[in-house]
């Protein structure tokens, strides 16, 4: 096995710039910034979106109803739903 071909894997603090949420994780991401977190100094990586601010994880997701081809055809030609007439 060759030596010195793998990047340095170490603990890094990620900072969500949207909410200010910080979390510690292992990463190979390099950073010149450092931060004090839980009494230790770690490299700091700033991210725009994390699980603290992403709409999927926060529940603020907007769902859109995708109409099917039949529904679009019926809307286009003004046809009523056959099941609704019964």
UniProtKB/Swiss-Prot annotation:
Molecular functions per Gene Ontology: structural constituent of ribosome
Record keywords, A-Z: Ribonucleoprotein, Ribosomal protein
Keyword Ribosomal protein: yes
A cellular component annotation (GO) from this entry: ribosome
Domain of life (superkingdom): Bacteria
Record-level GO BP terms: translation
Membrane spanning stretches: none
A Pfam family per the record: Ribosomal_L31
HAMAP family linked to this entry: Ribosomal_bL31_2 (MF_00502)
The family this protein is said to belong to: Belongs to the bacterial ribosomal protein bL31 family. Type B subfamily.
Protein name: Large ribosomal subunit protein bL31B
Species for this entry: Streptococcus equi subsp. zooepidemicus (strain H70)
Lineage, top ranks: Bacteria, Bacillati, Bacillota, Bacilli, Lactobacillales
Encoding gene, per UniProt annotation: rpmE2
């Amino acid at each position: 096995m060759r030596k010195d071909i793998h990047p340095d894997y170490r603990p890094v603090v990620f900072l969500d710039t949207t909410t200010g949420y910080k979390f510690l994780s292992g990463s190979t991401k390099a950073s010149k910034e450092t931060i004090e977190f839980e009494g230790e100094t770690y490299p700091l990586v700033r991210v725009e979106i994390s699980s603290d601010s992403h709409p999927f994880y926060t529940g603020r997701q907007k769902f859109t109803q995708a109409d099917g081809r039949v529904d679009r055809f019926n809307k286009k030609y003004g046809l009523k739903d056959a099941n609704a007439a019964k």
